[in-house]
Amino acid sequence: MSKVSYYTADGLKKLKDELEHLKSVMRPKASQDIADARDKGDLSENAEYDAAKEAQGLLEMRIAKLEEVYANARLIDESQLDVSKVLVLSNVKIKNQSNGMEMKYTLVAESEADLKTGKISVTSPIGKGLLGKSVGEIAEITVPNGTLKFEILEITRE
């Protein structure tokens, strides 16, 4: 059984766009590369042909994987989410209890995580530790280098 993944509308659109690009642009290009290499003569010693066939195989594997992910993708209905607790798609302002540093994160599905833009996965140690907490609560989170304590200062939705 395949794993169900949850996506925002943007994340699901990106997944669909990538899949369509691979099918409509990259797949025909891979076929053309094979045809071009085949036209160059003897296939038994044609490294270009072998490379093109291998690239096509990798592309088809990627397409199959994305089709499976897309088939098991579920859209998150943001209107149904409780704003009093930290959930997926929550914007959370937290304060590190040991150094007083404040940080803002948005909790997202694993496939949409991007630390550079402040999006952390709900399956990451910090994401797991914050889930279900309310404003004012202290989350004790075990990370590879010890335990961190974060106070939940604010929970909002976009």
UniProtKB/Swiss-Prot annotation:
Phylogenetic classification of the source organism: Bacteria, Pseudomonadati, Bacteroidota, Flavobacteriia, Flavobacteriales
Name assigned to this protein: Transcription elongation factor GreA
Q: Which PROSITE patterns match?
A: GREAB_2 (PS00830)
NCBIfam families given for it? greA (TIGR01462), PRK00226.1-2 (NF001261), PRK00226.1-4 (NF001263)
Check the record and name the PANTHER family matching this protein.
Answer: TRANSCRIPTION ELONGATION FACTOR GREA
Among HAMAP family, the record links this protein to: GreA_GreB (MF_00105)
Q: Which UniProt keywords apply?
A: Coiled coil, DNA-binding, Transcription, Transcription regulation
The record ties this protein, via Pfam families, to:
GreA_GreB, GreA_GreB_N
> What is an annotated GO biological process for this record, any one?
DNA-templated transcription elongation
Family statement drawn from the similarity comment of this UniProt entry: Belongs to the GreA/GreB family.
Q: What does this protein do?
A: Necessary for efficient RNA polymerase transcription elongation past template-encoded arresting sites. The arresting sites in DNA have the property of trapping a certain fraction of elongating RNA polymerases that pass through, resulting in locked ternary complexes. Cleavage of the nascent transcript by cleavage factors such as GreA or GreB allows the resumption of elongation from the new 3'terminus. GreA releases sequences of 2 to 3 nucleotides.
Q: Does the keyword Hydrolase apply?
A: no
Gene Ontology molecular functions: DNA binding; RNA polymerase binding
Q: Which residues form a coiled coil?
A: 47-68
What is the superkingdom listed in this entry's lineage?
A: Bacteria
